Amino acid sequence: MLSLREQQLQVWFKNRRAKLARERRLQQQPQRVPGQRGRGARAAPLVPAASASAPQRGPSGILPAAEPTICSLHQAWGGPGCRAQKGIPAALSPGPGPIPAPIPGPAQIPGPLPGSIPGPIPGPAQIPSPIPAPIPGPISGPVQIPGPFRGPIPGPISGPAPIPGPISGPFSGPNPGPIPGPNPGPIPGPISGPIPGPISVPIPGPIPGPISGPISGPNPGPIPGPIPGPISGPNPGPIPGPISGPNPGLIPGPIPGPISGPGPIIGPIPSPAQIPGPGRLQGPGPILSPGRMRSPGSLPGLAPILGPGSGPGSGSVPAPIPGPGSLPAPAPLWPQSPDASDFLPDTQLFPHFTELLLPLDPLEGSSVSTMTSQYQEGDDSMGKKHSGSQPQEEGGSVNENHSGPRLLLDL
């Protein structure tokens, strides 16, 4: 008694033989040519189709037995899985041949290309892997290149080609045009060559080398090196260091610090402060005129109070007075007229006095109180000449408590 597996194999072979016999009959039937009728149509030659691909029969006229394997019922009736496992030839199919029609869709190249591509690629090409060889021809369409290039590209690229990553290598050629975008960060390296154009942005750090061109904007920081050219803009901050070289031109602004080097002062010198009060002279010391008297050498113990000078302005710091020993001959301060001699003293009668009275308004007051002042006597001849006209002397001092007109009348 046969088992179930053997029965299934017998049924499968029976069906297979019947199918092959039916296909053979269809292939052996003559193909009727249109236009021929009657017995001439049967005389046409037979055209066997795929007769070489038919399975060869064994010596006994039956098909060779297959290897005994376990298959299910639906696989035994011609299932594709069982046919692939048993090695049974599948349905008849045409042999391999060339495909004349081109592929209409985009070409996808999965692996690297061993050789160069001679012709251009008309459609968009997607190249996922790097290309070991250079591309000799131009690429007409847009190219998306995700990976890096191992070799250089000799030909030009006509279409736009975006570069996703940064460029690590330096540029060998010159840069013909300026960079259109702003520079967000500082320049890390030094600039070896000169800068041809003006710099619109402020420079945060010091500049070690000299600057050949003018600077248009303000300079926030100090400049350690020499500046050969003029500075067109204003300088907001003072110059911290001394000026070593000569200054050929004028300085338009005020100088905050002292000037150490010698040089002429072009601007006006401010005059000392005026003595307050409408017409009275206040203070314990003698009254001097800075434009007339040059030195308080004969007044050792008293601090002089300077009167209004002849300068155009007024300041709070008086001009320096040279030391003793270089006193020129005193010049007359007032005109020698009969009207002025009644109110003003004659300086020729008092050559040893180093204190002088300022001209006052006669209508404002006639009494002038002066303090005691010391003076040094000259030679005996000058003392004898004016001994009859001097008032009372006590220890080299002169006490004048008279009024101005009375003193002049006594003289």
Swiss-Prot record:
Bias-annotated ranges (Low complexity): 27-55, 295-307
GO molecular function: DNA binding; DNA-binding transcription factor activity, RNA polymerase II-specific
Compositionally skewed regions (Pro residues) per UniProt: 95-139, 149-246, 319-335
Main localisation: nucleus
Chain spans, region Disordered: 20-63, 88-246, 286-340, 363-411
Source domain of life: Eukaryota
Protein location: Nucleus
One Gene Ontology term from the biological process aspect of the record: maternal-to-zygotic transition of gene expression
PROSITE patterns given in the database record: HOMEOBOX_2
Protein name as annotated: Tetra-peptide repeat homeobox protein 1
